[in-house]
Amino acid sequence: MLSAPAQAGEKAHQPAFLTSTGRLNFFRKSRKPAAAGTATNCLSCPIEKECMYSAKKIYVERHLRNGNAKWPVKIVNPEIEDCLAAQGLEAAEEKLVRDLGEDYTAATPEGQVRSRPWFGRCVWEADNDVCDDQSVTMTWEDGDEGGRGAKTAQFHMVAFTAKICERRGRIYGTKGEVEYDSTSITTHDFASGRSETHHPELRGGGHGGGDEGLATQFVLAVAAVKEGKLGAAEAQQKFIGCTLEEVIQSHAMVFAAEEARRQRSVVSWPLWWQRKVLDKLHST
């Protein structure tokens, strides 16, 4: 998204400004079904069987009973995979339900409630303040050199989708377009009118195989440096595909977008980066 240069030495074409809108629309206490009463945990809720957001339905019925003890089940209890393999489904389900049933009361100190995750907690009672629908728009102006033209990128994060924790998108260019999701990439050439779909190798692990991919590339980069084949900066560019500064910038842009969202403003990316990051680095 930061449009790093393809060749070392080229000037990066970075966004000129960005803005963001969004809020927590649905998962608020005011939207809690009246029939749920004062329940703060799914397992003690009178409408658990009818609620589509039941923790028991999500973790136990949808995942564990179908043989999946990995994400998201193992987030509740990291030992659940070993339990399922060694003791069977009944024991694993008993352990998982016990964890999901952990609850608090009105007498529980607020600090204690906030200090830990409650995986069986009512989704409308949670203290989560992450937007369930947010859009970020980044805008580039014409580049000073290299013929890099103006462009716009829009990122939409929404909770209400069949593709939970999956990414999909489209890139519209002057000569064609690219459409992708977590399993395939489709390219369309405007000149020929032809479309072609590619199915890359799917790796295991978290983030759609991204965790394994990053770890592999990091090991390759370290090996290249230790063996004297490349310098650290060269290895990082070749195997990781970005510099440390670009990593920091990509994370910083999230904070800039949040500032834009909260203040309902348009944020100048160069000025924000200078004021919030570079000036502070130089002052320490």
Model-assigned labels for residue ranges:
Residues 1-26, 32-121, 136-146:
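Oxidoreductase and adenylate-handling cofactor-binding alpha/beta cores
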Residues 11, 29-32, 49, 56-57, ...:
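Context-gated lysine
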Residues 120, 126-284:
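C-terminal helical cap and adjacent loop that interface with cofactors, partners, or active-site loops
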